[in-house]
Amino acid sequence: PILLTQTEKYINSGRTNQLISYFHNLALYHTGKLPYQLFDYPQKLGVKALYFPWNSDSRESEYGHFIYEDLGYINEAQRWEFEAMVVWGETAPHLLNLARYNIVNKRPEVARRFINLLKQSLFYRGDAEELEKQLHAGSVPGLRMALENNKEHPARFANVINIGPELQYLCEQDTTNRMAFEYLMSDLLLSNNIVRFVDNLKFIRHFKYPEMPPAYQEALYIYKLGVDGETFSKSGFNVSENTEKRFQRYYSLYKNRQMQRLKAEFGNTYWYYLNFISPYGDKIIRN
């Protein structure tokens, strides 16, 4: 994948950029690598590497919709796209997306307004005509509506500062939403929130991982070290013997201040992130 290759090249140069990190983590997810390679690169930005908190930044407004569209959280994707159109004008990409989002949100007449604008353009008339065929179908190929069957709470005010509660909500409403699960796990790990990570690890049972990703095992073991046996058993999970041996090796190097070897052997682990990289310090959040 070109996006993954290009963002890797940038990150490997030692530079830090929120937009690059945002697209890099999206690329990791879409190639099935997010739980396995999240810590292969120094996540110096913490949770800001996953998404853009809403802060009325014109450049961010242009790209903020991608994660929400991929999650199937179309209302939020639409909000970002509308704000982007206000900032950047009625450009074809924004009009296309707003038409698509309004179709799946069952607002055909609103979608038609955007389609009619597109039909006036030389290069996007064909796209507009294709979307026009979808107007009353209420669906667009390749676009999922994660909360479509949620009739009890159809209206929801999104948390525009912190995506964590939104990811939790999506997981609870649709236990098959793998992206929501992996992003929730990443969000909780990057924010040092190990207790909530373990509380939500139950969702992993809805997906077919060959085995629990190493970073998840590493976080689970940190949790195990901080609670009594009875509390840990309530999690319903076990830590592999290999993970425990690796931690003993990690702790031995750490205790003996063999920092170069520690980084060489464990620089891509959650333990190393928590000790040396997390922008929130090395303390575990327990609530």
Where does each model-flagged region fall?
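Generic structural motif recognizing short loop/turn segments at the entrances and edges of beta-strands
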Residues: T176, Y216, N268-Y270
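Intrinsically disordered, low-complexity segments enriched in Gly and acidic/Ser/Thr residues
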Residues: N193-E241
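Terminal, low-structured helical/coil segments at or just beyond the last alpha-helical repeat
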Residues: E166-L170, L190, E230-N287
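Soluble catalytic regions of membrane-associated enzymes that act on cell-envelope
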Residues: P1-G164, Q168-N193
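Generic structural signal of hydrophobic/aromatic residues within well-ordered alpha-helices
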Residues: T7, F114, L118, L131-E132, ...
